[in-house]
């Protein structure tokens, strides 16, 4: 991948090597979520490599946030919800003891963005949703290495991220993109024939579109492989998550959409593959566990020993691969479409999907109604203007419209079903 210009994520480049033998200072955004809690577990097991200086969370789990701050000796904690500050201060006092100095507390919608620009080596953005865009931009602008688990910020603000990021500054934390990142180290970008992104197929692999009509929220939340938050789990059930990952792969590695393939791999052992022009394919494989991708994001270019379990190759196992059923799961094709449209189209796609997932969880939309509504919102948005630079204001305006329109359409569907 030595071609010029370099892609956003390049395993051949190290943006900011650590001087000396001391641990890296890390800020963890979304510390009480799935990625955040696993990252903190990794840090606690490797105090010689990493030191967490600050934590942020939405504010729904203040007891856990306080425990994390105490165990990590974090200097600052931040919550998006200002109303939970008294409860957070009480939880911190319970951890530290009366009379002991507490970490600095930041609160409000900009708190995570403030932390992203604070003094540290690496920012791990583990926030869920497009609200992670501002912290992503802040970390890049401040010159921090960005371990990116918040795929939505790249998807909705691709041109903005690309304008700020320096070569090698972004390390992907998604399991699929961390896998591609490592497999791409074997050659140059000119050597790459295609990227192959694997999908477990979710809980409804093998079902026809008609069979998906009766899917319930409980069904959709029962992912066969990964333990994730409810939004990402439902995105995996619709395969929207895989569509977002296709857009992300295009933006990270500068590979055209027609050279990014999705295949279903139920075992989730192979996380992605790179096919090279000489006919060889390099696959990255581990048992399903986010410890490895998180360790790559925080530790690259070094390997973190025992970050994740390894295979026992003495035991027989079956590894299967199947083509994706685009009729039953149209989300990947729709994601390719909006990715090629570019501009504000990916932001509209993502925002509409977030609203439709909430509508499905509340009972307003049926399972198939998620993608039907998202498709309609994307179609109504039309083709973004070309020849103009995307701004944060453009993204926010498009998201606001898409959310309002998705809610309106979901309400109409709920009324018709009543």
UniProtKB/Swiss-Prot annotation:
Cleaved signal peptide residues: none
Enzyme class label: oxidoreductase
InterPro entries hit by this protein: DXP_reductoisomerase (IPR003821), DXP_reductoisomerase_C (IPR013644), DXP_reductoisomerase_N (IPR013512), DXPR_C (IPR026877), DXPR_C_sf (IPR036169), NAD(P)-bd_dom_sf (IPR036291)
Requisite cofactors: Mg(2+); Mn(2+)
Binding residues annotated for Mn(2+), in chain numbering: 174, 176, 245
Pathway: Isoprenoid biosynthesis; isopentenyl diphosphate biosynthesis via DXP pathway; isopentenyl diphosphate from 1-deoxy-D-xylulose 5-phosphate: step 1/6
Chain residues that bind NADPH: 32-35, 150, 152, 229
NAD listed as a keyword: no
Superkingdom classification of source: Bacteria
Pfam families assigned: DXP_redisom_C, DXP_reductoisom, DXPR_C
Gene Ontology MF term list: 1-deoxy-D-xylulose-5-phosphate reductoisomerase activity; manganese ion binding; NADPH binding
UniProt keyword Metal-binding, yes or no: yes
Catalytic reactions on record: 2-C-methyl-D-erythritol 4-phosphate + NADP(+) = 1-deoxy-D-xylulose 5-phosphate + NADPH + H(+)
Biological process (GO), any one: isopentenyl diphosphate biosynthetic process, methylerythritol 4-phosphate pathway involved in terpenoid biosynthetic process
Residues binding 1-deoxy-D-xylulose 5-phosphate, per UniProt: 151, 175-176, 200, 223, 236, 241-242, 245
Record key words, sorted: Isoprene biosynthesis, Manganese, Metal-binding, NADP, Oxidoreductase
EC code: 1.1.1.267
Role noted for this protein: Catalyzes the NADPH-dependent rearrangement and reduction of 1-deoxy-D-xylulose-5-phosphate (DXP) to 2-C-methyl-D-erythritol 4-phosphate (MEP).
Family in the record: Belongs to the DXR family.
Name of the protein: 1-deoxy-D-xylulose 5-phosphate reductoisomerase
Organism: Streptomyces coelicolor (strain ATCC BAA-471 / A3(2) / M145)
Lineage: Bacteria, Bacillati, Actinomycetota, Actinomycetes, Kitasatosporales
Gene from which this protein is expressed: dxr
